[in-house]
């Protein structure tokens, strides 16, 4: 049996024809190719694109990072590729000729939507009416939260220009140039926050861009200085000559009947989401460092056997951060000292972080590609096919890729936030954090220092709101426009909710990063204090235990090694505020070493010169006189930068993030003795993240990664 243009399937079943290898008419091949390479490399590319000073568009190659750059109203300028002018003009001319020839076309000679049975020969008037009736948004006072953020509006303007440049929409090139001039002059039309279902495109908000271009009296824009201006002043600031545009047939519909507002905001959201996903991976590795975790969880074989690329990459990135980490070397020594000091396996928030983050990265990456396709698509109706001389009536305005991608992205963001909260909760809990103080309290008196307790409560609040936002938008569709738009994507609504989720994840990331830096500093104090305690105890032991009253060597001198073991086993912050207190474990355990030696001393205990027990009081008295001062001196040395032992963080690949938070942003180690609050410090990090200042130190942590896991050996 043979198949035309194909081959019989391998099992030989009749009637089943498998297509032969050929071109990629369904676009699956291209979609697959777009996912090759590492996620980190893709993020690096995005960052490089974001920083380019010129965004040149021709309709088919716009990137989400470029949208984010223009939306931010920074240095990026927009330029229209002249190669698009001819095809844009051709479609515009076709519409005019079509109407003059009496061709009946939707939105040119007909009414709109469910009322498309109506007819008119007044093409220009029809477009003006379209813009008028779509100006149905509400702004309130303009300061009460009913206005779409300027960044989202700028993103929408850029995306709409790009999609119209492909020449299938019937609009003049000059209108697109005018919108680009508004962008470059940082003049932003005021669009309503709500009012679109992103089904026949984002009709209502886009109509306000059209209203400004056509000089409607109710059109308002925000000038570069933040003041509100009318259409005439907006044109003057932007340097647009020739007055307002009188819309020709189809031009109003071309401007409003597209998905640019939803996909524009989605682009800015995904630029942030991709970077925050990388940050979550690195913070998970730093969490392992300060928790004295076991890096075995990143071993490549574990993840290779699971097959999921997001998981494999997340593990490889964490593995890279932890490879050679001074904290991991120290944690290994602690484990060898006493394997029973902590559980055999770390808890899920650490040990399964690659398995948890991997699928979220895959979702965010897939959503990024989907939105990138959308912002380069022709998404209005009808489409003008000049080559075949016809108007195609379809539904590319349906923004389902936006609604679905944003719902999925928001769920992924919620999952990342949940992991971050679980890690934070372990970090501040002294039952789980392997020796750090409760609430990461950094002061000398834990009764007057509750550290990050308030921050943990805030994190619970953030996480709860984020989990609520994780619920889908797209299952709340209502039939609209006289049941013509009976299914609709809710793309912009979903994008807005995802934008909210991004803001919350930034709050959580800022809080967690400050807490991790606090933990790094506490580990530094811990190591210096422990060293000081060992030195002090050894000095006291040599003074009080080495000899008897006659100067002969005493059997108690053999306690020194066991005393050091007990110091190593005991958490510094379990006793540091009052080391000689009998309510704390250190003195009890040191005494117990001497008591055990005394019990093993047999009959020699009955001789005053050989009794170990007789040495206990002298040993403890000397410790009370010297140990508190030794601990205070060690803490003070860390605080004034003269610590005997340097911080291990400087020997770690995660150091650039710590340096960024502590040195560049000037955040401080928090204690109850000082007036500075956690909120004041984490707000510095939040502002920096909002400004994108965290990107370079984050990528610096990974600059040596070659894109592969460590070899299995």
UniProtKB/Swiss-Prot annotation:
Predominant cellular place of this UniProt entry's protein: cytoplasm
Domain of life of the organism encoding this protein: Eukaryota
Chain positions found as 2,3-didehydroalanine (Ser): 200
Enzyme class: lyase
Catalytic activity: L-phenylalanine = (E)-cinnamate + NH4(+)
Enzyme Commission identifier(s): 4.3.1.24
Family: Belongs to the PAL/histidase family.
Name of the protein in its database record: Phenylalanine ammonia-lyase
Gene name in the database record: ZB8
